[in-house]
Regions:
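Active-site groove signature of glycoside hydrolases
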Residues: 121-151, 198-201, 313
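Conserved, mostly hydrophobic/aromatic
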Residues: 54, 139, 195, 236, ...
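C-terminal motif of bacterial Sec signal peptides marking the signal peptidase cleavage site
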Residues: 15-17
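Glycan-binding loop/region signatures in secreted carbohydrate-active enzymes
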Residues: 99-103, 238-300
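Glycan-recognition patch characteristic of GH18 chitinases/ENGases
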Residues: 22-121
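Short, acidic/polar
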Residues: 35-49, 114-130, 178-186, 292-303
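N-terminal export leaders
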Residues: 3-7
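Substrate-binding surface in catalytic domains of secreted glycosidases
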Residues: 64-75, 150-262
Length: 336
């Protein structure tokens, strides 16, 4: 029995075997990199336990898989050339209903109406994933409604079953933090090995300016989802960049661009004591910036660990505080 538990604890540090750990087994902290579809050409630091480097969408007409982004085109996993002796990052692929500028929930609905089409699409995804040597599959079907749950389950289950039949890839489902009606954790856990909970934005591009994610908001939402699914089956999604609100609207901004704008406006970037976010305002230039940095990410990971969650996924890394990557490298032991 002891040998079995030790084996599970060791293989669970890789995404290729990221099934939930048995109760009582304390895993080390895992930090994943969720690279955006527009991340091509960015510097790819080492230290991550897993990297989502390929994005595949469902074509709105044919329902066939279409690769919209592949960060690494040379066949290597990110982190493979680590000089620090870190274990190479396990690669994951994201299957998403996002295309253009929005999620297409209508594609999932239409696909679910034809069982044959679901089977063909699932098989096509499985073949593509097998050829890409993905060790994990992240299903990203956001902005569905509560009445769509059965359709969401049908499509997700078909893709998951087909993927498992073709490879040992783990299945992860990305879900929002707050919408338990459309994305009930216990139900979705019947399909997915892990649930990646996006714990942001508290304030985003569709809201007035404010903290992107505060520690209190993060802890409350993560605690709710962890209680639904179990701490061993949750991955906490954390933002790593910022948002600027100005006369043109709101959009994401990188840490370095935010620092540059603040310097040009002779405006200090201060830490908001209530949320822990960095904040800068320029009345002269008409913008308001809220920003995530290394210190905030460390705090959020500490809060998640107190709850019992051990897996964390960082989004928006192409715009992150450069010091964050040093934290990731130090957080991941070469002995894993």
């Amino acid at each position: 029995m002891t040998r079995r538990i030790l084996t599970v604890a060791l293989v669970a540090t890789t995404v290729g075997a990221c099934r939930p750990l048995p109760p009582g087994v304390r895993a080390p902290t895992e930090i994943w990199a969720i690279w955006s579809p527009d991340s091509r050409g960015v510097s790819m630091p080492d230290g991550f336990a897993a990297t989502a480097e390929t994005w595949i969408t469902i074509d709105t007409i044919s329902f066939r898989p279409t690769i919209i982004s592949r960060v690494a085109d040379d066949g290597t996993s990110l982190g493979q050339q680590s000089a620090a002796g870190l274990v190479p990052a396990r690669r994951a692929s994201v299957i998403t209903s996002f295309q253009g500028t929005r999620y297409h929930a209508d594609v999932i609905r239409a696909l679910s109406e034809n069982a044959d089409a679901v089977g063909v699409t699932a098989g096509a995804f499985a073949s593509l994933l097998s050829s890409s040597r993905a060790q994990a599959v992240i299903l990203d079907f956001q902005e569905m409604a509560a009445e769509d749950l059965e359709m969401l389950m049908d499509v997700s289950r078909a893709i998951a079953d087909s993927s498992r039949a073709h490879s040992a890839a783990a299945i992860i489902m990305m879900i929002p933090a707050a919408d338990s009606a459309a994305y009930p954790a216990r139900t979705l856990g019947r399909v997915a090995d892990l649930l990646l909970v996006k714990l942001f934005p508290e304030h985003g591009v569709t809201t007035p300016a404010g903290p992107i994610v505060s520690a209190a908001w993060f802890t409350r939402r993560l605690g709710q989802r962890a209680s639904e699914a179990g701490v061993n089956r949750v991955v906490a999604g954390i933002p790593a960049d910022g948002i600027i609100w100005d006369r043109r609207g709101a959009r994401r901004i990188s840490y370095l661009d935010a620092v540059r704008l603040a310097r040009e406006a002779s405006t200090p970037i201060i830490r908001d004591p209530a949320s822990g976010n960095l904040h800068a305002v320029s009345s002269r230039d008409g913008w308001d910036i809220w920003l995530v940095d290394r210190e905030l990410v460390e705090k959020l990971i500490d809060e998640g660990r107190r709850i019992g969650v051990t897996r964390f996924a960082l989004f928006g890394l192409e715009g992150a505080d450069p010091q964050l990557f040093e934290f990731v490298r130090r957080a991941r032991s070469p002995k894993l």
